[in-house]
């Protein structure tokens, strides 16, 4: 299997490495201009949210050594200067949050990369959501996007509902955990004034393209979904509230049955189902994209229903990055 490089060793970059180790994918190089190798060891070993790394991690002669395997470390600001080929890295995870267009992400090809997966939504790169539209991938695609964590939660659920009951239209709200772009105390935030308010003190209404992006991965839903976010003072795990008008009448029990069926069948490992009395911290470390909360949803009538689905917005998403790469590798071979 082709080897992986990670550009940007932040929350997602580090968790993609953890996910790769869990899934038997080989990461051979990491680039981050702001973190030296000793600091990488520390950040990878200790994680306030996901706990201490269970394996071994050390620095040795400029390499990051994880579970005895050497990972080449680069410290380049300009992606055109990263010599991926020297480390044998062909599939690059672009997790800086900076190079999110085809043009910008294509900078990695200069150093020998063959494919780039952007771990964020992209304005122009084809977007993929595991369990939803992977079959649309073709080996001639060089730069792709794994969409957002919220789209990865919403799209599998929306697909199941649309395939079985037809979504006429819908609105989504994500109650979203704090992320690194937010402020610890009030501070300037460009044009998004509310986003600059203290993350630990506030529920912050924010924009999200996650619902509209579903229309890119499920074309039949294009223009039928939109949504917004509330940023809340929790460190991890978010929850999608999808309220939809259905084309076909359905009881809530019928909807639950179809979601359960999908979670045990074609979407196993992507979509999960629970009837337990769960709260957000119960999903820290959950590797699914979306966990349907059967007890939290509520119908108004047989054509109008609110559906609830949880997601570990860090680790579930990072696992999908590796799943997407593995799928690409199987098709590119």
Swiss-Prot record:
Pfam families for this protein: Gp_dh_C (PF02800), Gp_dh_N (PF00044)
Gene3D superfamilies according to UniProt: Dihydrodipicolinate Reductase, domain 2, NAD(P)-binding Rossmann-like Domain
GO molecular function, one term: NAD binding
Presence of keyword Methyltransferase: no
Class in the EC hierarchy, top level: oxidoreductase
Cellular component GO terms, alphabetical: cytoplasm; cytosol; microtubule cytoskeleton
The organism's place on the tree of life at top rank: Eukaryota
Compartments, as annotated in UniProt: Cytoplasm
Subunit-structure text: Homotetramer.
Protein name (Swiss-Prot/TrEMBL): Glyceraldehyde-3-phosphate dehydrogenase
Top-level taxonomy: Eukaryota, Metazoa, Ecdysozoa, Arthropoda, Hexapoda
Gene expressing this chain: Gapdh
